[in-house]
């Protein structure tokens, strides 16, 4: 009997085919991130995005990403500048938190 390892998923839902994976949804396209999460059988990881009165954006990643391949879902829909800055701040936070790779899924 042949086992298809491409669909193998560990019990902790963050390891797919031996790779530690995290999926994050930012504010612009949560619905798409939920569809990806369901199709890939990966939970969306927790992130807290705060916008201060002066326009500054703060991102707090609530899960450890050290050594993980990270995917971020964020589009450039209006307001494009705010969504792009949110993505850049998130990418910086992930890099500083030692994510192995960062891949952005950015639909137009």
Stretch-by-stretch model annotation:
Residues 1-108:
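PRPP-associated nucleotide enzymes
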């Amino acid at each position: 009997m042949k086992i298809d390892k491409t669909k193998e998923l560990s019990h902790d839902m963050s390891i797919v085919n031996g790779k530690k994976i995290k999926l994050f949804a930012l504010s612009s396209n949560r619905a798409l991130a939920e569809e990806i999460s369901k199709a890939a059988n990966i939970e969306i990881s927790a992130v807290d995005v705060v916008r201060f009165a002066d326009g500054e954006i703060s991102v707090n990643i609530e899960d450890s990403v050290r050594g993980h391949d990270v995917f971020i879902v964020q589009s450039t829909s209006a307001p494009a500048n705010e969504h792009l800055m949110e993505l850049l701040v998130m990418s910086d936070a992930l890099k500083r938190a030692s994510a192995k790779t960062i891949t952005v899924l950015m639909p137009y």
